[in-house]
Regions:
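Charged, glycine-rich intrinsically disordered N-terminal tails and low-complexity linkers that flank
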Residues: 1-81, 85, 151-156
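Detector for methionine-enriched segments
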Residues: 1, 30, 34, 76, ...
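A generic signature of intrinsically disordered, low-complexity regions enriched in glycine/proline
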Residues: 20, 35, 45, 87, ...
Length: 226
């Protein structure tokens, strides 16, 4: 990803942030672009999967139509509520303070958003001097699964959607490392409340992501003319 094509924006309100990003492919949805076409689709010359095309159409409708009302499940609300506490725990674990210059919590002081070539964008939860951080606050049983089965070696297979999210954000922030943090304060033992995994930049996957972004952008621009 060319550094000269990366832009950083800070929005005062969440509505401004949402409005700006609604026509862009985002890190959190990147895995939808990465799905491989079926054998039949490939035989027909298709390079984007049905799921990827559905995502493209969703972005187009976000631009051309009135936005639909957002729905927040209890799990999503829980995650949003616990994230600040997770950030504080992370800072403590790293010997940092949330006000340190090399510990940037991207939801404080405005909504940060990185954009690549006006085509895709994303924001990690925390930016460190040498890494970014992606924080998840899942249900307790999911957190336990992560702690038991997910590690640096298999996260690309176990959590492919988060893996692609992190790879895209690493490119946007020009970092070679991402810390994946799962946090659940409901566990009685403090050490069981946190699961931290170091994920390295996967240059091959990152190139594949960039290729899919270009393909999807071309398709989106063509469909916008219809």
């Amino acid at each position: 990803m060319e550094t000269s094509k990366i832009e950083r924006f800070v929005f005062e309100t969440q509505d401004d942030w949402k409005g700006f990003r609604k026509g862009l492919f985002t890190s959190s949805q990147m895995n939808r672009l990465m799905a491989s076409p079926t054998k039949k689709e490939i035989e027909l010359g298709e390079r984007l999967s049905k799921g990827a095309k559905t995502y493209i159409l969703e972005l187009i409708s976000n631009v051309e139509a009135e936005p639909k009302k957002e729905f927040y499940s209890s799990a999503m609300e829980w995650g949003n509520e616990q994230e600040p506490q997770a950030v504080l725990r992370l800072a403590e674990m790293l010997g940092k303070d949330v006000t340190d210059n090399d510990f940037i919590y991207t939801s404080i002081g405005g909504f940060v958003f990185f954009v690549y070539d006006k085509k895709s964008g994303g924001t990690p939860d925390v930016i460190l001097s040498d890494a970014i951080v992606e924080i998840k606050c899942p249900d307790s049983h999911t957190h336990r699964y992560y702690r038991t089965f997910v590690n640096s070696d298999n996260i690309s297979v176990e959590l492919p959607d988060y893996y692609d999210q992190m790879q895209h954000n690493m490119m946007l922030c020009q970092k070679d490392t991402c810390l994946f943090m799962s946090f659940d304060p409901r566990y009685k033992e403090a050490k069981k409340q946190v699961h931290l995994i170091e994920v390295k930049a996967d240059k091959i996957r990152q190139e594949q992501i960039l290729e899919k972004i270009e393909l999807a952008h071309e398709q989106k621009e063509a469909w916008l003319l219809l």
